[in-house]
UniProtKB/Swiss-Prot annotation:
It comes from the Bacteria. It comes from Pseudomonas entomophila (strain L48). HAMAP family: UPF0246. Disulfide bonds: none annotated. This is UPF0246 protein PSEEN4534. PANTHER family: PEROXIDE STRESS RESISTANCE PROTEIN YAAA, PEROXIDE STRESS RESPONSE PROTEIN YAAA. InterPro entries: YaaA (IPR005583). Pfam families: H2O2_YaaD. GO terms for cellular component: cytosol. One of its GO terms (biological process) is response to hydroperoxide. Belongs to the UPF0246 family.
Length: 258
């Protein structure tokens, strides 16, 4: 089973990594093509394209300018440890052990607007490029066109390498839309996390994002390889709802946030 999650806007390059092991992103030719195009944009154009403040636009213009295809621990950090935000708060990668990182490297992937698909230990230089960015390029009108069926093909290969065909989707709609299901040779399992609010179970963004991270961690630590085992997930008060679930769409409820 392979799990996919979204990246995060918030990055941490200040905290020393808890593991020295690292690998290189596998699709850097594509990343470099995007970087070369992004370097042609002024900070004002970046601000308009990405809906960023002038300060953030300037920061990311500088990031694009300093990006290099030569990745080292001095200019990059393992993706799973560099990303912050709600999903990664739930995942809490800093407290994983070396055996956990080994398992995650084979069973977890992060979708990325710039890198396409990242493994946990892949070194990543800092960037901001949301998958939904309407950056016209040589392959089409946006990043979905740029990546085309590539991400699906890479996921197919990762699944084939482990002799499986189950893809656990814990990514946002924006990012999972980059996975072309028509090209995917996998059974996709979708998951919703709902919290009780005003007498109804609803998807509350902050809690749902954190829960995606918690389930990712659960899969890693419990070495889950069968979707049926996902129903055991009970972290921080969530429980499986057979009434609301379908075979390929699991729903977890929580009555009180912890």
């Amino acid at each position: 089973m392979l799990t996919v999650i979204s990246p995060a806007k918030t990055l941490d390059y200040d905290t020393p990594p808890v593991t020295q092991r690292h690998t290189l992103p596998q699709y850097l030719d594509d990343s470099q093509a995007l970087i070369l195009q992004l370097r042609e944009l002024s900070p004002a154009q970046i601000s308009e394209l990405m809906h960023l403040s002038d300060k953030l636009a300037g920061l990311n213009a500088a990031r694009f300018g300093s990006w290099t295809p030569d990745f080292t621990p001095a200019n990059a950090k393992q993706a799973l440890l560099a990303f912050k935000g709600d999903v990664y708060t739930g995942l809490d990668a800093e407290s994983l052990g070396e055996d956990d990182f080994t398992y995650a490297q084979d069973h977890l992937r992060m979708l990325s607007g710039l890198y396409g698909l990242l493994r946990p230990l892949d070194l990543m230089q800092p960037y901001r490029l949301e998958m939904g960015t309407k950056l016209a390029n040589a392959r089409g009108k946006d990043l979905y066109a740029f990546w085309g069926t590539r991400i699906s093909e890479w996921l197919n290969q990762a699944l084939a390498d482990q002799g499986d065909d189950v893809l656990l989707n814990l990514a946002s709609n924006e990012y999972f839309s980059a996975v072309k299901k028509s090209a995917l040779k996998a059974r996709v399992i979708d998951v919703d996390f709902k919290d009780l609010k005003n007498g109804q179970y609803k998807i509350i963004s902050f809690y749902a994002k954190k829960a995606r991270g918690m389930m990712s961690r659960f899969v890693i630590q419990e070495r889950i390889n069968d979707p049926e085992q996902l129903k055991r997930f009970d972290v921080q008060g969530y429980y499986y709802s057979p009434e609301q679930s379908k075979p390929d769409h699991l729903v977890f409820l929580r009555d009180h946030a912890e």
